[in-house]
Amino acid sequence: MNYNDPLEPAMIITKVLSKSDIVGNVVLPKAEVMSVLTRMNVNDQDLLNGVEVQVDDIMEDDLYTVTLKVSGIDKPKYYFGTGWSTMKHSLDLSEGDVLKLYWSHLDNKFVVLNFQYSVLPLMIPV
């Protein structure tokens, strides 16, 4: 991913975390996930079984593997299952925090966009 290129808004998932997201699995906003799915090359059956995806925290240089799943057919709910617990604790997320993820289709992974506490270092050639 070239971090100098503008981000595609349709590839961003934003979620204000609820108590149930912190205690259990995080349910992701349906419309935003469906937009990202257009670039993920997965089908409904894949999601019912669960698809392992990587989530890259470029600020801390951490890479997480989480399972993206869907439950229900008539009213689908998209969520992170396995791996979410490790990720939320490592990112020190709590109720009311905003989780912001960008799907980098070129790298085939999510990138954490929670930069509010850090500043990206400038790369100055020497």
From Swiss-Prot:
DNA-binding region: 20-118
Keywords of this entry: DNA-binding, Nucleus, Transcription, Transcription regulation
SMART domains in the cross-refs: B3
Signal peptide from the UniProt entry: none
Record's GO cellular component terms: nucleus
Ranges annotated as spanning the membrane: none
Major localization listed first in the record, in broad terms: nucleus
A molecular function GO annotation: DNA binding
Location in or out of the cell: Nucleus
PANTHER family per the UniProt record, alphabetical: TF-B3 DOMAIN-CONTAINING PROTEIN, TRANSCRIPTION FACTOR B3-DOMAIN FAMILY-RELATED
Descriptive protein name: B3 domain-containing protein At5g54067
Organism: Arabidopsis thaliana (Mouse-ear cress)
